[in-house]
Amino acid sequence: MYNKVIMIGRLTAKPEMVKTPTDKSVTRATVAVNRRFKGSNGEREADFINVVMWGRLAETLASYGTKGSLISIDGELRTRKYEKDGQTHYITEVLASSFQLLESRAQRAMRENNVSGDLSDLVLEEEELPF
């Protein structure tokens, strides 16, 4: 049997890392992943998928991930349960084994500042180089 998740989406908030009582780093995040088809209103719908990361992976995402960051995540689908007020609740989430931020700092800055255009505008032509 095989349990593998690969997704690309955007972080819905700045990831926050916490330490467990045994001093392990854990980061939880939600990733908005657009569906491949449009909904009845003509717009793309998104799924909001909970992700959990442990250790150095958690620390790295907490340091470099920001709200809106385009991210690729590999991992496994996990289900856990807990009791609250006599009710059993189930949570399905992705346990990440790796991730990659898919935007450069310049692309992220353009998105955050709502700058239109593409990165080719930022490249100097040979004639403009001082050497």
Curated annotation (Swiss-Prot):
Residues 1-103 form the SSB domain. InterPro entries: NA-bd_OB-fold, Primosome_PriB/ssb, ssDNA-bd. GO terms for cellular component: nucleoid. Keywords: DNA damage, DNA recombination, DNA repair, DNA replication, DNA-binding. GO terms for biological process: DNA recombination; DNA repair; DNA replication. Transmembrane segments: none annotated. The keyword Acetylation does not apply. GO terms for molecular function: single-stranded DNA binding. Pfam families: SSB (PF00436). A motif (Important for interaction with partner proteins) lies at residues 126-131. Gene3D superfamilies: Nucleic acid-binding proteins. CDD domains: SSB_OBF. Homotetramer. Plays an important role in DNA replication, recombination and repair. Binds to ssDNA and to an array of partner proteins to recruit them to their sites of action during DNA metabolism. This is Single-stranded DNA-binding protein 2.
